[in-house]
Amino acid sequence: MPLGLIGEKVGMTRVLLKDGTAIPVTVIKFPVNYVVQVKSQNTKDGYNALQIGAYEAKEKHLTKPLIGHFKKHGVPLLRRLWEFRVDNPEEFQSGQQLKVEDVFKPGDLVDVWGISKGRGFAGAMKRWDFAGFPKSHGHRYHRAVGAIGQRTDPGRVWKGKRMPGHYGAKPVRVQGLFVVDVLPEENAILVKGSVPGHNKGIVVVEQSTIAYRKSQKLKQKRYQFIIENLAKEESQEVAES
């Protein structure tokens, strides 16, 4: 079962290999992550999991049940909580601090969850990638949705019909991203490619749930050359900037 951390998307940049090849990466930094609660099959919870928290909060911004929950487990008041299913909960305890090197290493595949950038109200072509109508031949429906209804039966628009509406600002998870480097001094990682959300947005990074797939193992093997040829001083400068 995957373990992960709560962090912040710093932004995108690139790192250089020894031969000058540029690799696009996203920098993700992590604050102190606390193990808030350990759940086990042997307790009333009935399953194995870790509740992880990050980003300290003021008491006035939390409910009394949450404040009591944090005090019970001996951790600071926290703004963000996330639960990860694990196989070995007995190896952790409430109040324990998790660092980036405890969870990730270069060459890992990770899944990243975040809130996508909001783009406001958008039409069906932008929001759902509809092809649109022909460009000419005497009509005025170039970017229109087209027919949305049914016949007498059922006589309504199906729930979930793809139509114009608010685009973005939704939870998105990108799977199988390659960890290019881990920077313990900065408590940060560099992942190949982009991750959801805007800069300074909260993201959750966990060990990939699809790493067992043959296609992912081949990708992991194919990208090993990045780690072998990475100019370490380059990645360190990226994180510090």
Curated annotation (Swiss-Prot):
Pfam families: Ribosomal_L3
GO biological process: translation
GO CC terms of this entry: cytosolic large ribosomal subunit
Keyword annotations of the record: Ribonucleoprotein, Ribosomal protein, RNA-binding, rRNA-binding
Domain of life: Bacteria
Single GO term (MF): structural constituent of ribosome
InterPro entries: Ribosomal_uL3, Ribosomal_uL3_bac/org-type, Ribosomal_uL3_CS, Transl_B-barrel_sf
Function: One of the primary rRNA binding proteins, it binds directly near the 3'-end of the 23S rRNA, where it nucleates assembly of the 50S subunit.
Oligomeric and partner information: Part of the 50S ribosomal subunit. Forms a cluster with proteins L14 and L19.
Family classification: Belongs to the universal ribosomal protein uL3 family.
UniProt protein name: Large ribosomal subunit protein uL3
Gene responsible for this protein: rplC
